[in-house]
Amino acid sequence: MVKIGNIELGEFPLLLAPMEDVSDPPFRAVCKSNGADLMYTEFISSEGLIRDAAKSVQKLDIFDYERPIGIQLFGSSIETMAECAKISTAAGPDLIDINYGCPVKQVACKGAGAALLQDIPKMVAMTKAVVEATHLPVTVKTRLGWDDSTKNIQEVAERLQDIGIKALTVHGRTRVQMYKGSADWSLIAKIKENPRINIPIFGNGDIDSPEKALEYKNTYGVDGIMIGRAAIGYPWIFNEIKHFLATGNHLNPPNLEERIKVCLQHLEFSIKWKGNHGGIVEMRRHYANYFKGLDHFKPFRSRLVTSPSFDEINVILNEVKAFYLNAEHVDA
């Protein structure tokens, strides 16, 4: 049984990665219903939260059906991060996660996210301040290092465990790599092989199929896997991996009707959370992913991303169903 503090996650948990502008409550809802064991909010700027910026505050929204769920924070100020840990604790999550892995320029160049991989003493001090600011378990997500010459994840794992984090997720690339090339899980495996390490270690990067999940589980010995981009428009990946790990057999992939059903559920959650206009606008980024692989889908997508109402979107999706099922443009 993998545990983070007192949170029981099963024998080999599958985590949904925190993704900016993606892993909001509606997206988390469809991932949870399709097998995600632990989820996180989008990462929240500590500076934005202190300023009471509306976007940052709204990211604190969590719902009981999502549990267990963590709030992920990032920032460059130790004091601000500690204060935001207190604010986040009051929002009622199951844990607090610190982002030391975001590679994007807007974050790293401000001394946050993956930038802390260049200043391990500050990373340790920041983590200690967050641990001391909350009664909740604190976890960390990071990368192998800043670049190929500074892959310091072994030191990071030991030092962060020593000051009290309860789990560590490692993306198998450096900051300089961004999302290019292949993720290197061999260094993640070395963390697990370290006799000093006793917290759960989760691997992240390039898991996009049940076969790869099984291969990486067996090869690298991690306690669980965090899935990010592969779940966008395809929340079924969690249950597909679980079924394959348990039986060695594949679940049937979702047919077109199932894709439409879950897409509409996602839209309904989005409208419920952000209102009619906001929910419809937020959903527009997801249609292409839900219907990836369909030939001739572009005209339908153009209508979906300009439609102003749920009813109209529902009509369009019914047209999608009729077009593809009747014309046999897709395996259903």
Model features per residue range: what roles?
Residues 1-332:
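Flavin-dependent oxidoreductase catalytic cores
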